């Protein structure tokens, strides 16, 4: 059974940078916290906890003088301000692509634009982006949501960094159809687009797909969705222990990809587990 790994599976630049900052902070031996999970990988969060880097939900949980790391998804503007007011040492591990989306929203809002964010309203990245708007701001998950928005004379559009280009295009088209001045910033991460494109091609060339990543990871869930639309025999796992031999009955080629928050050691473990399966002995 041939196992084919997508070229760009695993950590993207922003996640690699965030985890590196977190592990460097852990090596100092000082009390270190992350505001929320540093990335959407329970296994990485657990490993950091074992090294003394503890996730907290609120700045008030950290004593004055402590170190707090801003997660890769970013945080709300008021949370960052609260950390500064509390005299904490702030290590900002916000992904540069997310930071750019925050900056665009702040600028557009000051220029009188109503903001439309394309994404998942409950995702921490989107909640952080929204907080930088000084005026009206709306989160839409699809072009159908645009129909429910009020009329706007000036619309500024940004996207959650893990959205697909097709999704952003559909929302922009729907906004343009309503009239008014529209300014769009493509804030989708290049790594997201590359991974999604690779996943489509790989899913079309194999008998079964395995997508590795946190079940709470938006970009991993999106990869699994994209693959499943092309290949129903697609399975989303977090770790190797979740692999089921029955998935590979009659399979000649297995495609493997992984979300941007998935560390290399987990990818290697999953591939080793799949490679050890003798498909001819599956009953």
From Swiss-Prot:
GO terms for biological process: dimethylallyl diphosphate biosynthetic process; isopentenyl diphosphate biosynthetic process, methylerythritol 4-phosphate pathway; terpenoid biosynthetic process. InterPro entries: LytB/IspH (IPR003451). It comes from the Bacteria. Isopentenyl diphosphate binds at residues 40, 73, 123, 217, 219, 261. Pathway: Isoprenoid biosynthesis; dimethylallyl diphosphate biosynthesis; dimethylallyl diphosphate from (2E)-4-hydroxy-3-methylbutenyl diphosphate: step 1/1; Isoprenoid biosynthesis; isopentenyl diphosphate biosynthesis via DXP pathway; isopentenyl diphosphate from 1-deoxy-D-xylulose 5-phosphate: step 6/6. The keyword Phosphoprotein does not apply. [4Fe-4S] cluster binds at residues 12, 95, 189. Its cofactor is [4Fe-4S] cluster. It catalyses: isopentenyl diphosphate + 2 oxidized [2Fe-2S]-[ferredoxin] + H2O = (2E)-4-hydroxy-3-methylbut-2-enyl diphosphate + 2 reduced [2Fe-2S]-[ferredoxin] + 2 H(+); dimethylallyl diphosphate + 2 oxidized [2Fe-2S]-[ferredoxin] + H2O = (2E)-4-hydroxy-3-methylbut-2-enyl diphosphate + 2 reduced [2Fe-2S]-[ferredoxin] + 2 H(+). The active site is at 125 (proton donor). Keywords: 4Fe-4S, Iron, Iron-sulfur, Isoprene biosynthesis, Metal-binding, Oxidoreductase. GO terms for molecular function: 4 iron, 4 sulfur cluster binding; 4-hydroxy-3-methylbut-2-enyl diphosphate reductase activity; metal ion binding. Binds 1 [4Fe-4S] cluster per subunit. NCBIfam families: ispH_lytB, PRK01045.1-1. Belongs to the IspH family. Catalyzes the conversion of 1-hydroxy-2-methyl-2-(E)-butenyl 4-diphosphate (HMBPP) into a mixture of isopentenyl diphosphate (IPP) and dimethylallyl diphosphate (DMAPP). Acts in the terminal step of the DOXP/MEP pathway for isoprenoid precursor biosynthesis. This is 4-hydroxy-3-methylbut-2-enyl diphosphate reductase.
């Amino acid at each position: 059974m041939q196992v084919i790994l997508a070229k760009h599976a695993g950590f993207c630049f922003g996640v690699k940078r965030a985890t590196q900052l977190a592990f460097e902070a852990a090596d100092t031996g000082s009390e270190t916290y992350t505001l929320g999970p540093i990335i959407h990988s329970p296994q990485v969060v657990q490993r950091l906890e074992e090294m003394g880097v503890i996730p907290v939900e609120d700045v008030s949980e950290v004593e004055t003088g402590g170190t707090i790391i801003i997660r890769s998804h970013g945080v709300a503007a008021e949370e960052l301000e609260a950390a500064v007011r509390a005299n904490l040492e702030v290590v900002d591990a916000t992904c540069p692509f997310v930071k750019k989306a925050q900056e665009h929203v702040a600028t557009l809002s000051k220029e009188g634009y109503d903001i439309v964010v394309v994404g998942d309203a409950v995702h921490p990245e989107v909640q952080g982006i929204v907080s930088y708007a000084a005026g009206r701001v709306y989160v839409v998950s699809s072009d159908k949501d645009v129909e429910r928005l009020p009329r706007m004379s000036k619309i500024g559009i940004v996207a959650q960094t893990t959205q697909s280009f097709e999704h952003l295009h559909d929302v922009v088209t729907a906004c343009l159809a309503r009239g008014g001045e529209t300014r769009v910033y493509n804030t989708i991460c290049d790594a997201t687009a590359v991974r999604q494109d690779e996943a489509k091609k790989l899913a079309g060339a194999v008998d079964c797909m395995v997508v590795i990543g946190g079940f709470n990871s938006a970009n991993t869930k999106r990869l699994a969705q994209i693959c499943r639309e092309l290949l129903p025999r697609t399975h989303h796992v977090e770790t190797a222990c979740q692999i089921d031999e029955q998935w590979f009955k009659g399979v000649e080629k297995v495609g493997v990809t992984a979300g941007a928050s998935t560390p290399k050691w987990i990818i290697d473990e999953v591939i080793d587990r799949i490679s050890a399966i003798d498909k001819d002995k599956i009953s």
